[in-house]
Amino acid sequence: MKFSPIIIGTMRWGIWGANHSIKNVQKLIETSLTEELTTFDHADLYGDYTTEKLFGDAFSEMKIKREDVQFISKCGIEMPCENRNFKIKSYNYSKEHILNSVQNSLENLKTDYLD
């Protein structure tokens, strides 16, 4: 497995920052790939749990082979927000939470594996 020398962070691509459209995310992906930056860093909670889906929707419309890019994701923080039933911010590293987070990331990123 080879990652690009610089990893592109997506934390502020969604509602926590620029609130990019699908088209803008596609431009960011294209620009990254033009510079040979092929590794994209995600976390389940980015954008109140919406940024991975935004990225997945954008990427799935592009004609880029999945094996030509790397997707990294993280989990463990339960953040209160509209689309989650967490009452307080907390950390959860249980096997159940990790497996659930990974499954959600796979679905949102529209991929069958994480790198």
Give residue spans per PLM region.
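Glycine/proline-rich, positively charged
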Residues: 34, 85-115
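N-terminal binding-site loop/beta-alpha segment at the start of enzyme catalytic domains
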Residues: 1-70
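Structural motif corresponding to the early beta-alpha repeats
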Residues: 62-95
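A short alpha-helix capping/helix-coil boundary motif
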Residues: 5-9, 81-84, 115
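Short glycine-enriched loops at secondary-structure junctions
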Residues: 13, 75-77, 104
